[in-house]
């Protein structure tokens, strides 16, 4: 089963903490749903890159960690 973090309705200021906690407390595979916001996608990928986590963009607005 894939763990999912849905960021719809979350504030940009909270994304760093939410994504960091999610990726550090769960094991792959995981999905992070960012929606249509390019800012949200950038915030998420910044956290993943900071932690050297490999990710793929499967659909616009969804990032997968395998």
List each model region and its residues.
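Long, charged, low-complexity intrinsically disordered regions
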Residues: 1-66
